[in-house]
Amino acid sequence: MQTDSDTRIATVERKTKETNVFVSLDLDGNGEYDVDTGIGFLDHMLEQLSRHSLIDLKVRAQGDLHIDFHHTTEDTGIVIGEAVRKALGDFKGIRRYATAIIPMDETCTRVSIDVSQRPYLIWKVGFTKPKLGDMDTELFKEWFQAFAQNAGITLHIENMYGDNNHHIVESCFKGLARALRDAIEIDPRAANRIPSTKGVLGN
């Protein structure tokens, strides 16, 4: 893992017997992305995450896709989450809390986050089909769980209504992107302060 102390940039690589995942990101970017996980639909979702959060994101993942997509999906969430946490540094000045409500045609999803170093996921999302393309829909919860745990954020995702499974998933990723964009933004009125009366996050 490498972190630039003057800017909110991090690079993380994770190698196991199941996957090899590389992530480089810039929290203060322009939403530029270069993503290749070997899973087309996951790539599409990570591109949405980058574009709508304005986080510059590069992802390279190689995994045991001949078995299934589980390990690659989960490990990609792990490494992106870890990179976000590392890039945040001391967490000083961030707004910390944010909520985004994302409509997408017939679908509407609410995402709330607390960038607190207290990881937790509430997932109130259901699907009407077991797969989107070749990807099992149950894997999306695995991705968000891995991301929240390793980014150190409390993450609540609730699909309030919707019928189209693609729209439901995409609204979850876009909701995370918009909430993350707001929560990690530096508040100029509190730029050098930890956003907690305790003076520390995570305890």
Curated annotation (Swiss-Prot):
GO terms classed as biological process: L-histidine biosynthetic process
EC numbers: 4.2.1.19
Keywords tagged on the record: Amino-acid biosynthesis, Cytoplasm, Histidine biosynthesis, Lyase
Protein name according to UniProt: Imidazoleglycerol-phosphate dehydratase
Domain of life: Bacteria
Cellular component GO terms held in the UniProt record: cytoplasm
Reaction catalysed by this enzyme: D-erythro-1-(imidazol-4-yl)glycerol 3-phosphate = 3-(imidazol-4-yl)-2-oxopropyl phosphate + H2O
Residues forming coiled coils: none
HAMAP family cross-referenced by the UniProt entry: HisB
Family matches, as PANTHER family: IMIDAZOLEGLYCEROL-PHOSPHATE DEHYDRATASE, IMIDAZOLEGLYCEROL-PHOSPHATE DEHYDRATASE HIS7
CDD domains: IGPD
Chief localization: cytoplasm
InterPro entries in the record: IGPD_sf, ImidazoleglycerolP_deHydtase, ImidazoleglycerP_deHydtase_CS, Ribosomal_Su5_D2-typ_SF
GO MF, one example: imidazoleglycerol-phosphate dehydratase activity
